[in-house]
Amino acid sequence: MMGTAHHNQTAGSALGVGVGDANDAVPGAGGGGYSDPDGGPISGVQRPPQVCWERFIQKKTIKVLLVDSDDSTRQVVSALLRHCMYEVIPAENGQQAWTYLEDMQNSIDLVLTEVVMPGVSGISLLSRIMNHNICKNIPVIMMSSNDAMGTVFKCLSKGAVDFLVKPIRKNELKNLWQHVWRRCHSSSGSGSESGIQTQKCAKSKSGDESNNNSGSNDDDDDDGVIMGLNARDGSDNGSGTQAQSSWTKRAVEIDSPQAMSPDQLADPPDSTCAQVIHLKSDICSNRWLPCTSNKNSKKQKETNDDFKGKDLEIGSPRNLNTAYQSSPNERSIKPTDRRNEYPLQNNSKEAAMENLEESSVRAADLIGSMAKNMDAQQAARATNAPNCSSKVPEGKDKNRDNIMPSLELSLKRSRSTGDDANAIQEEQRNVLRRSDLSAFTRYHTPVASNQGGTGFVGSCSPHDNISEAMKTDSAYNMKSNSDAAPIKQGSNGSSNNNDMGSTTKNVVTKPSTNKERVMSPSAVKANGHTSAFHPAQHWTSPANTTGKEKTDEVANNAAKRAQPGEVQSNLVQHPRPILHYVHFDVSRENGGSGAPQCGSSNVFDPPVEGHAANYGVNGSNSGSNNGSNGQNGSTTAVNAERPNMEIANGTINKSGPGGGNGSGSGSGNDMYLKRFTQREHRVAAVIKFRQKRKERNFGKKVRYQSRKRLAEQRPRVRGQFVRQAVQDQQQQGGGREAAADR
């Protein structure tokens, strides 16, 4: 009997709710014995009377109001709920569900509603329930297939205890009784959650309407439907406690008009509710202060200094003068300014403002010195990023109490008015320039006169220098003969190499109004005027001697291979590790008036795979090609990896700023020669391969012919070769038989 009673218990018994009945009296003889299966009493077996707990435990099942407009979903969820021992009251829409809720005889324990429904939506139904004095104690669980964060937050902020995402699992429905138990436990006053107020959550401004139901009339849930911070009256079970949501018990909202004290922010130790923090980007950035307070003025001054230093560190805006209060009831939680309780004197205010201004100036000076050091290290940088600096507010501003100061880190150094040269240079640095990574860099590269280490220095020597060079006894002079400043004119790391006594005079190129673009001479007349410049490899050239020595060694090795009378030029270095084609701007400022400009420039050629040397115009693959045009200059290209010389002779073509006969696409004479050489190599390789294949096939053919001849000589009998002797004997025997027949 007792076993049968235990067997009939269901999930409701686990809640302390009995659903099965048991007999009050045990049948049998004497009222105390058991009976056998046939009905006869069993004597001699006496047991004490049993206690049926079902008589004392109230029988109750949890009633769930299921609201869903979809018939199939409603039927499936209803079946699952009934299988979990819940009593289900289905409703097709929100209006019908509200009718069931208004009828107090239904005694609904839990509401499970869909968010998106025609007519009265789930959020509207939730708002009505939360505004009702009696129905607001009923837990409301929202369910939807849309799990957008805005929709979930809006439902939970309006008072829903949970949000289920479809498809709903059976285990989730089994645990719905916990919400009812938690609500009853909190409203009875026996738990630690009693007396906790629910948080008023303002309407979100982040466009949550896009995540809401599109086919529902959700206009009536915007005004007067949000739970407030007012304490509930004592009409709820006589306990005078506030109904608690399972998730927003301590939903701290920074932009809330009512600020909470630290003791209100603390959760109970046994709280099972989550914490939701709602931030607003336009207000929360002004309130990044911890909840601490100081009652001593000295400590307050030290705290002000500390927070000013922290302001300089993180760059967060703060108002050190007035505490921002949206309502008179709001408590100021800023430790830097407790004006209502501890007003500051005017002297302390001025001192604080002066300290802030001094700190700002010191920070600006520190940043300026750092920027100066970086500029000194990167003096060869071609372009500078624009400085996005903001103004530092002054302490003597009249409208300072109404403006939130924004103390941001600036890369622009605060300079004096007397430093005109630095001011002009700083303004020019702030000008937006095109980067070296631009698509137009390969065609036009501006050379700035005020930037150190960025200009190209081309050596141009008159034709009369050859006779002067023959009189010089120094074979290799590694020192530069020009008196130009190495840093300003970009000649740092460059060398002037004189081969076989030839003296080269450096002409410092500066940007002028009338510039001549010197193009490379054409090596092959049939190809027209094409550029023979090699792609220059540019890298950062720090002001040290090691890079200069290495460059001098490379140039010296290249000069040793050159022929006498050639015009050498300076090695070019550029601070950007970028490979692109460059046109050199050479002015006729320092050149001879009657002497022609040679316009020769040495650039580094990146290594070319598959070639042992540079093939020149004259067909010589020795690495250097010598020209014979006396009046015309020669363009020399120095390879950094293998110091071979490549000279293309021709005429110097002069064009205006808008013209130019160089293609700039890498299809110059050198590229043509390289491609031609590659083509020759490929043709030779193909011919050699075909010859080898022909020889190999010829050998195979010979072997095949010999085997064929042997096969004809040695006939097969049943697929096997037969010896020649056996074959001859057979032939002789056959001849004898024929003769006998005759």
From Swiss-Prot:
Q: Which Pfam families match?
A: CCT (PF06203), Response_reg (PF00072)
Q: Give me the stretches of Polar residues compositional bias.
A: 236-248, 318-330, 380-390, 503-512
Q: Name one GO biological process term.
A: rhythmic process
Q: Name it.
A: Two-component response regulator-like PRR37
Q: Name one GO cellular component term.
A: nucleus
The record's region (Disordered) falls at 186-249, 290-346, 375-402, 478-570, 590-671, 697-742
Name the UniProt key words of this record, in alphabetical order.
Answer: Biological rhythms, Nucleus, Transcription, Transcription regulation, Two-component regulatory system
Q: Where is the CCT domain?
A: 682-724
Ranges of biased composition (kind: Gly residues): 656-667
Highest taxon of the lineage: Eukaryota
- CDD domains assigned: psREC_PRR (cd17582)
Q: Which organism is it from?
A: Oryza sativa subsp. indica
**Coarse class of the protein's main subcellular location:** nucleus
Q: Where is the composition biased (Basic and acidic residues)?
A: 299-313, 331-341
Write out the biased-composition intervals (Low complexity): 186-195, 490-502, 618-634, 719-731
